[in-house]
UniProtKB/Swiss-Prot annotation:
InterPro entries: ABC/ECF_trnsptr_transmembrane (IPR003339)
One GO location term (cellular component): plasma membrane
Pfam families named in the record: CbiQ
Protein known as: Putative HMP/thiamine permease protein YkoC
Membrane topology, from the record: Multi-pass membrane protein
Keyword field contains Oxidoreductase: no
CDD domains on file: EcfT (cd16914)
Quaternary state and interactors: The complex is composed of two ATP-binding proteins (YkoD), two transmembrane proteins (YkoC and YkoE) and a solute-binding protein (YkoF).
Known function: Part of the ABC transporter complex YkoCDEF that could transport hydroxymethylpyrimidine (HMP) and/or thiamine. Could also transport other HMP-containing products. Probably responsible for the translocation of the substrate across the membrane.
Amino acid sequence: MKQPLHLINPTVKAAAVFCCVVMLSFIYNPYTPACFYIIIVAGVLLAAGIPLKKWLLFTIPFLILAFGCVWTAAVFGKVPTTPDNFLFQAGPISINSDNVSVGISLGFRILCFSALSMMFVFTTDPILFMLSLVQQCRLSPKLAYGVIAGFRFLPLLKDEVQLIQQAHKIRGGAAESGIINKISALKRYTIPLLASAIRKAERTALAMESKGFTGSRNRTYYRTLSVNRRDWVFFCLVLLLFAGSFLVSLCFAS
């Protein structure tokens, strides 16, 4: 059984993420992104069924990036140190509360962006997302089905690489060891992969044309996606949670 977040229309989900990213870009206090990040993580873990271990594993790079932003803003911030905002002295570097606040705000903003992105990626089928863009956002079917076909080709290209590697071994080619040798071996794989991709794309295009695909928007769909009440409830709930985070931040700021 699919979790609630998996059932939301992909376009509505993307619109909610985009609105949150835009609004967070204009929030400079550290309390709003911190509160909103906690809400995002709790909501995704409860409503998407994502394992905590998997979430933490993908969060590690963004934690490192966020810590780098906090450190950079605290050490190299432009706000001058005064007796009112002075925190401590680290050798020749004076750390003040204003620069630390800016750094924490940037760090939590990065974590919010990453959490929203992972929520979308982990709970959205790419094929359904492209179909939703065609049906709800009037995206060109030619572009959408081209992207879908390219996405379907990715596993095939992986199999092609394995076949080329096995063919080289049969013909006496030495196995690549080390990063430099593997990078140089890519040159031998590029032309066969490119030729295979062109043949697959040509066959796919001919098959689509033979079945009557013209790229027109006036067509029927095997799988129809719609925006229903559940999707609007999700969109409004996300905006309300963001507004609630902002109101909570006002209480902390005061």
